[in-house]
Curated annotation (Swiss-Prot):
Catalyzes the dephosphorylation of undecaprenyl diphosphate (UPP). Confers resistance to bacitracin. Its EC number is 3.6.1.27. Its main location: membrane. Belongs to the UppP family. The chain crosses the membrane at residues 47-67, 85-105, 113-133, 150-170, 196-216, 225-245, 253-273. HAMAP family: Undec_diphosphatase. It is a multi-pass membrane protein. The keyword Transport does not apply. Bacitracin is thought to be involved in the inhibition of peptidoglycan synthesis by sequestering undecaprenyl diphosphate, thereby reducing the pool of lipid carrier available. This is Undecaprenyl-diphosphatase 1. GO terms for biological process: cell wall organization; peptidoglycan biosynthetic process; regulation of cell shape; response to antibiotic.
Length: 274
């Protein structure tokens, strides 16, 4: 295997690890990065790679939040943690809208909306939305300050925002769910954590869907590229999640909004020129 392909896989994993958790759109970045860094693989495998490396990102959430995610305790005997079970029920509810639309219409959505025009528009529009929401919420105290306070109705509403991200690339799954949560009155830290947890079934399901669609017939070289990309995404995701949680305890999301606007304009200008 050429060393250059390994370096490409590492770099793509780094991009995935950063952009999957920060509300800045992994798709928007991957479209730009793909213009300059192309894996020397088949188109089918490239599509699988770009989705399956998300498994590395998922594992980072499981590692960092294991005690909050595991629904049972072994301390002093086996018993279910009701608050965690309730949280998982809400997460499943939030996943329903995207699942209903995403699975049967995955190919049609990609064909219609996976282009630079859609990505640039959603980057800019949700960037503006972030700034507007933070300006609106300035000085206000959030109504929901813990995940246990999220109701089933709130879970459905957050799920609808996740559906928007599933349909329109560039929205950013984390960006859409955080925007939805902030609009409802969820605190920044709770919105971010709920978004992290919500990613586990969503991204795991998306990875399985791609694997089943394109099959599991990989060469040893392709398996190595997948593993390296996942490992890179895993390590960088841990750092990105820790950074975001520290950052939003002292700052709002407006900086990410401005970044999205700049990136959206850059994507639009680049592809119009090229």
């Amino acid at each position: 295997m050429e060393h250059i392909e390994i370096l490409k896989a590492i770099f793509l994993g780094i991009v995935e690890g950063i952009t999957e958790w920060l509300p800045i759109s992994s798709t928007g970045h991957m479209i730009l990065v793909n213009e300059f860094i192309r894996l020397n693989v088949t188109e089918a495998f490239k599509q699988v790679f770009l989705v399956v490396i998300q498994l590395g990102a998922i594992l980072s959430v499981v590692l960092l939040y294991f005690n909050k995610l595991i629904p049972f305790s072994l301390n002093g005997g086996f018993y279910l943690k009701k608050d965690v079970v309730s949280m998982w029920i809400k997460i499943i509810i939030s996943c329903i809208p995207a699942t209903i639309v995403g699975i049967p219409f995955d190919d049609k959505i990609d064909a219609l909306f996976y282009n630079y025009q859609t990505v640039s528009i959603t980057l800019i529009s949700f960037g503006i939305l972030f700034i507007m929401i933070e300006n609106h919420n300035k000085g206000k105290h959030p109504r929901i300050t813990s995940i246990s306070e999220i109701t089933y109705t709130t879970a459905v509403l957050i799920g609808i925002f996740q559906l928007i991200a599933a349909v329109f690339p560039g929205t950013s799954r984390s960006g859409a769910t955080i925007v939805g949560a902030l609009l409802i009155g969820v605190s920044r830290t709770v919105a971010a954590e709920y978004t992290f947890f919500l990613a586990i079934p969503v991204m795991f399901g998306a990875s399985l869907l791609k694997l089943f669609k394109f099959g599991l017939h990989f060469t040893s070289t392709e398996i190595t590229i997948l593993f390296i990309g996942m490992l890179s995404a895993f390590i960088v995701s841990i750092l990105a999640i820790k950074f975001l949680m520290i950052y939003i305890k002292r700052h709002d999301f407006k900086a990410f909004g401005w970044y999205r606007i700049i990136l959206g304009c850059a994507v639009l200008v680049y592809f119009l020129i090229v």
